[in-house]
């Protein structure tokens, strides 16, 4: 969203410009979420995390407490990586930083029953449905093996950092924590 708001024609290459775009885009994103949830008489809260929430027991504990309080207050937490300070997602050479993985980590932290990841594809296909008309939708995956991982290869959007492979990696994190996961459009 920040790329578009700043009038840039393509995804930035430098980390500092990506951070600036993230700072602009995050505010716009929250305005949209606030408006949408307000229509359902719900309050949305912005929770920006960095991946050190996994490595620091204190930060993890604080994050869990925040999520628990928000949920007790019937507030919908809108979670995103804090891309203005956490640059893993912005550095194309790093593969760990993406919102799919972050969502699975959060679902695991709060012991969620279900994680739903939204995407522009209906779910996992035998091949990339954007380029292969004969690709078939896989409705249920019981186990993530090498065959499933190979199906997850493929393109991502021009502005995205994920793709189906990050969703499959997120599914592994979620299911290892007894959280079911759905990939839907």
Model-derived features with residue positions:
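Conserved glycine-bearing catalytic or ligand-binding loops at nucleotide- and phosphate-handling centers
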Residues: 182-184
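Nucleotide/pyrophosphate-binding catalytic subdomain
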Residues: 1-180
